[in-house]
């Protein structure tokens, strides 16, 4: 079973958000990295780009497939995880430590449409 962490918010497209104050750290879940296999490239937006909940903001490529990244929240990108540009495989080592973007949240009600750890675990078991 893939690792799921309590206190995070999860989307049906297998992205997570870790909220700290007015900011959200967005990445792919352990379930997603397991399904993708060895990650070889992460396409990320630029700092100051706007992301919109439910819309694409980048992609993750692995040796098996490419997968669009769908933002679970809306806001402004304030930081990207630059380490992933040179070492994208860190996502496979720990998807939750190796977030992709940090977003200044523009509408925290976006979180109401996401799953908690229990709901996400059940979703993945379907």
Regions found by a protein language model. Give the residues of each.
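Acidic, low-complexity mobile loops and tails
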Residues: 1-56, 93-126
